[in-house]
Curated annotation (Swiss-Prot):
Annotated positions of the N6-(pyridoxal phosphate)lysine modification: 298
Species whose genome carries this gene: Alkaliphilus metalliredigens (strain QYMF)
HAMAP family with a match to the protein in the record: SelA
Highest taxon of source: Bacteria
Keywords assigned by UniProt, alphabetized: Cytoplasm, Protein biosynthesis, Pyridoxal phosphate, Selenium, Transferase
Main enzyme class: transferase
EC identifiers of the protein: 2.9.1.1
Primary site of residence: cytoplasm
Record's protein name: L-seryl-tRNA(Sec) selenium transferase
A Gene Ontology term for the protein's cellular component: cytoplasm
Family as reported in the entry's similarity comment: Belongs to the SelA family.
Sections of the chain in a coiled coil: none
InterPro entries: PyrdxlP-dep_Trfase, PyrdxlP-dep_Trfase_major, SelA-like, SelA_trans, SelA_trans_N_dom
MF GO annotations: L-seryl-tRNA(Sec) selenium transferase activity
Length: 467
């Protein structure tokens, strides 16, 4: 059978749409979507036929029912939400690709109230005059960090760019070579520096930088000293770096401001909970740093934001920088950030109700109980499915605490028919996508990042996998 004859058997777009009307698809899906997806499907079939060889053409038949099913599936897929909730079984708490920090259930009411109604975003209720959107978080940030003032923009890279562009445009910023980090997505400190208009002045070497390296680079062109916390990697062995207090003292001596990007934004001493020390914002402010920048959606456990705290005279200048408006946060981010920060007013409340902190500090016994509960629900699902509880380690993720290994419990899955890769793919393509990891031909689900409310979806997904 030649290609022309097979192509002539392809139903027209109008024919297919008429048949779909009988299935009442158009009552559920807008007609414009049905028409577009039908055209795409017909075009896909046409291209496939044109690329077939003689052997494939000989036995090929067009299945109208299959075409209908494909169009229906395409329409439903097009109308469904792309950005949706998933289950994180990877054990990476701050999984960048899965949205980093989870917001607390305690604050969703506040976010919805602001999102669904008019709000006090930029109005002073007392005077009735225009106010500043930043005022909603300034006082709580000052209270929590001890800083003189605060400002919030849409992410930490923007915060660093704003700081450098305000303080050092056209002048030099001194930074250690060992701190010229890449912060993800190929964005690097030197690139941010260049975009800000500041001039990078590297000192020291990758593994060793001394105070005299900084001092020797100071000139009339020096606008600031920059300290970058290398939160996403560690240099081990023959190393030396300059302490924050020493850099601040050097800056004070030469009347040069010190800027620190601490990245992760820790507001609680995590050592109290058995974790490695991670520099807190309060420590930086207490050390006398003029400006500190950090993320809202890493260890802070809030929404994506770039938070700037420090000396009032510098932050006042940043508020007047035209770039500030271009990178400002919206009302949803502000509502989520304010509500998250208010949880920090009591440390126990923060640990209990901010998911990132709760997962970081959760003890192994609690995780083991959750693993046992899920194990009992899964073990009898399918004779081909072998379920075990094993020990493993979770990761912090999000470019934070790279050396920290958190003991955890994982559910491992093996199937007598399906490979681990096939199971992983099926779970990932479930209606509530489940992300796992594979090791030694086993699918692993880490209970540190799986919540009890996820269990019902995991059970349903594995029932589907077993079919």
């Amino acid at each position: 059978m030649n290609k022309g004859r097979i192509l002539s058997q392809l139903p027209s777009v109008d024919e297919l749409i008429k048949n779909l009307e009988h299935d009442k698809l158009e009552k559920m899906i807008p007609r414009s979507v049905v028409v577009e997806q039908t055209r795409i499907t017909v075009d896909t079939y046409r291209k496939a036929i044109l690329t077939m060889d003689e052997g494939s053409l000989r036995d090929y038949q067009i299945d109208i029912t299959s075409m209908h099913d494909e169009i229906k599936q395409a329409c439903e897929s097009f109308c469904s939400m792309n950005l949706r909730e998933v289950i994180n079984g990877t054990g990476v708490i701050l999984h960048t690709n899965l949205g980093r920090s989870l917001l607390s259930e305690e604050i969703k009411g506040q976010i919805w109230e602001v999102a669904s109604g008019y709000s006090t975003l930029e109005i002073d209720v007392t005077t009735g005059k225009r106010g500043s959107r930043y005022n909603h978080v300034v006082d709580v940030l000052k209270h929590l960090t001890g800083a003189e003032d605060a400002l919030v923009v849409n992410n930490n890279a923007a915060a660093v760019m704003l700081v450098l562009g305000t303080i050092a445009k056209g002048k030099e910023v001194i930074v250690s070579r060992g701190e010229l980090v890449e912060i993800g997505g190929s964005f690097r400190v030197p690139d941010v520096m260049e975009q800000s208009g500041g001039k990078l002045r590297e000192v020291g070497t990758t593994n060793k930088t001394h105070l005299w390296d900084y001092e020797g680079a100071i000139s009339d062109e020096t606008a600031a000293l920059l300290k970058v916390h290398t939160s996403n990697y560690r240099i081990m062995g023959f190393t030396e770096s300059v302490g924050l207090e020493e850099i601040v003292e050097l800056g004070n001596r030469y009347h040069i401001p010190t800027i620190e990007d601490i990245g992760s934004g820790v507001l609680i001493d995590l050592q109290k909970y058995g974790l490695a020390h991670e520099p807190t914002v309060q420590e930086s402010v207490k050390a006398g740093v003029d400006i500190v920048t950090f993320s809202g959606d890493k260890l802070l456990g809030g929404p994506q934001a770039g938070i700037i705290v420090g000396k009032r005279k510098w932050i006042e200048k940043m508020k007047k920088n035209p770039l500030t408006r271009a990178i400002r946060v919206d009302k949803l981010t502000m509502a989520a950030l304010e509500a998250t920060l208010k949880l920090y007013l009591d440390e126990d409340t923060a640990i209990k109700h901010i998911p990132t902190l709760k997962m970081l500090t959760e003890n192994l016994d609690t995780i083991s109980e959750r693993a046992s509960d899920l194990f009992r629900k899964l073990q009898a699902l399918d004779e081909h499915l072998l379920v075990r509880i094993e020990e493993d380690f979770s990761q912090v993720g999000g470019g934070s605490m790279p050396l920290e290994k958190l003991p955890t419990k994982v559910i491992t899955l093996e199937h007598t028919i399906l490979s681990a890769a096939q199971m992983e793919t099926k779970l990932r393509n479930f209606k509530r996508p489940i992300f796992t990891r594979i090791r030694d031909e086993k699918v692993m689900m880490d209970l540190r990042t799986i919540r009890e409310k996820d269990f019902v979806f995991i059970v349903e997904a594995l029932k589907t996998v077993a079919k």
